[in-house]
């Protein structure tokens, strides 16, 4: 409870951190946004240890370190608004309902993307618990931890491309925006190949990091799970980049459809169907199958309005 209370108390700072970082990045200062993010993350890692052990604060100390990290990031990003090159200023103004509605529309895709990890975790845990018990759930914990890192990499590619795509869209440069989409998609594919090559060659040691009890059964489940599950990133990278592109060119409905498919509809449907047909391997295969289905949907959506964006 102590951890949750401290964490929830600082929730507004987490939200503001996303907003401020996005403004700084889109206003031509991505380096500062990156430095702010890195400093916040490093502060969290270092002070997690300091607050928990040398200072003896335990879990509340870990919560405090996590909670303060976005405050530090916001403080660093705020430097941008005092620069002469900044085109963004804080002014007193009533909120515009029209702009708020537009922002909410464009934000649905990101919301669904963030929510999807929770949906996937819940569905997979329930299915694996029914199929093979607690050991299978522990194996999925290993897969999910590495999957979070992989997803963050592709989110980084999408967020890096987004301001450039938006700039092209603002200039009515549809060809330039499409070139950036191709570049981002190619980068995502190359990263997926490199990621899978490392994973395939080092699956055993990678799994062993989270297998302190040396459970042979858990290692076996996680080993096969990693190799099947991570095939999905060959499609997921493209889907994440494409969803970011669609949002950047003011196509919120298509962006939301892509995110909703990969985050909720396709992943749940594939999990239920494939687990019934193939057991545990079907659960692992649900992720690549759902991402492949979403990639087909995304290609259709991109092609349908290709002449306008």
Put a short name on every predicted segment.
Residues 4, 8, 31-38, 76-79, ...:
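Hydrophobic faces of transmembrane alpha-helices in multi-pass small-molecule transporters and flippases
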Residues 6-15, 41, 74, 110-122, ...:
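Hydrophobic alpha-helical transmembrane segments in multi-pass membrane proteins
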Residues 44-48, 74-78, 148-152, 196, ...:
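Hydrophobic transmembrane alpha-helices of multi-pass small-molecule transporters
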Residues 22, 49, 66, 79, ...:
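Transmembrane alpha-helix boundary and packing residues in multipass membrane permease domains
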Residues 14-33, 139-203, 236-258:
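Small-residue-rich hydrophobic transmembrane alpha-helices
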Residues 50-57, 118-145, 149, 167, ...:
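Helix-terminus/linker motif at the lipid-water interface of multi-pass membrane proteins
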Residues 6-25, 33-41, 62-75, 155-158, ...:
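Short runs within selected transmembrane alpha-helices of multi-pass transporters and secretion channels
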């Amino acid at each position: 409870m102590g951890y949750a209370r401290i964490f929830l108390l600082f929730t507004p700072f987490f939200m503001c951190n996303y907003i401020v970082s996005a403004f700084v990045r889109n206003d031509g200062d991505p380096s500062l946004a990156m430095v702010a993010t890195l400093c916040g993350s490093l502060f969290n890692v270092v002070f997690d240890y300091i607050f928990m052990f040398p200072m003896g604060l335990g879990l509340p100390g870990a919560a405090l370190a996590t909670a303060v990290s976005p405050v530090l990031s916001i403080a660093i990003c705020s430097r941008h608004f005092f620069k002469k090159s900044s085109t963004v200023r804080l002014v007193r103004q009533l909120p515009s309902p029209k702009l708020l509605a537009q922002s909410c529309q464009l934000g649905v895709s990101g919301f669904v993307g963030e929510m999807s990890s929770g949906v996937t975790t819940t569905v997979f845990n329930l299915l694996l618990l029914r199929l093979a018990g607690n050991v299978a759930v522990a194996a999925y914990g290993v897969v999910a931890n590495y999957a979070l890192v992989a997803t963050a990499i592709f989110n980084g590619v999408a967020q890096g491309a987004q301001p450039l795509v938006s700039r092209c869209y603002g200039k009515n440069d549809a060809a330039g925006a499409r070139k950036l989409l191709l570049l981002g998609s190619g980068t995502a594919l190359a990263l997926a190949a490199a990621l899978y090559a490392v994973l395939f060659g080092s699956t055993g040691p990678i799994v062993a990091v989270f297998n302190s009890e040396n459970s042979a059964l858990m290692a076996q489940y996680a080993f096969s799970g990693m190799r099947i599950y991570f095939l999905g990133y060959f499609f997921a990278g493209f889907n994440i980049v494409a969803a970011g592109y669609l949002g950047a060119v003011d196509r919120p409905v298509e962006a939301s459809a892509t995110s909703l498919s990969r985050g909720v509809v396709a992943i749940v449907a594939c999990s239920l169907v494939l687990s019934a047909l193939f057991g545990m391997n079907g659960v692992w295969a649900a992720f690549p199958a759902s991402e492949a289905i979403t990639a087909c949907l995304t290609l259709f959506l991109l092609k349908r309005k290709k002449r306008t964006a």
